[in-house]
Amino acid sequence: YRFGFTGTLDGTQTHKWVLEGLFGPSYKVTRTDELMRQGHLSQLDIQCLVLKHPPKTFDVYEDEIQYLIGHEKRNRFIRNLTLDLKGNSLVLFARVEAHGAILYEEINKHKRGDRKVFFIHGGVDAEEREIVREITEREHNAIIVASYGTFSTGINIKNLHNVIFASPSKSRIRNLQSIGRVLRKGKDKVKATLYDIADDCSTKSRKNYTLNHFIERIKTYNEENFNYEIITIELKV
């Protein structure tokens, strides 16, 4: 017999067919929202924070990404949000030098007292990542600034209360796996919060690329029956 298990199909029919060709018919035995109701997972609350920018047109996706990750006020907003949160927090980014390093420096520079702030990316070896995990399990207000590639899967931290999507992502699998980091129940932990940061730079005739990606994430939240709230915040130049 061959058995395959996953919590995150990518939502496309082709992906489902490929897996069924390898393993046979697929069965959905439960849902994340059902596991929450049964008390096996933490209750998830999603705060969608849409940062309203002045209208701006980008010729290609990369131009928009460079604009967003280099936006000082946007990065300060993420810094302030992270430092204001209670509990252990995970800040996820996509690009190490251009964004992750900047966020880490900003957060670490403005933290108060001896609050622990860690920076994890592909260049950090597995042993050090495990040390960070063990320390965070014992802390109550630690911050981990980590790349999606290193912390969206495979890291088991029960004592994690908040996740911040600091970089836009369209990938259904990566988003759901990243949410999975915060759903594990721990001692005295029954609730978790995701802060999904989106950006609206739309003109009258066109939505910007990453806003469309945010709309795709909302579709996923609806499909998974997640509770979410959309809050628009004016990001002045």
Where are the language model's segments positioned?
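Conserved interdomain hinge at the start of the Helicase C-terminal
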Residues: 56-94, 98-109
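Loop/turn-to-beta-strand initiation segments
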Residues: 1-3, 88, 139-143
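Post-DEXD/H (motif II) to motif III coupling segment of the RecA-like Helicase ATP-binding lobe
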Residues: 1-45, 221
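Conserved RecA-like P-loop NTPase helicase motor core
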Residues: 122-223
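A short beta-strand-to-loop transition that corresponds to the Sensor-1 phosphate-sensing loop
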Residues: 5-9, 94-96, 146-149
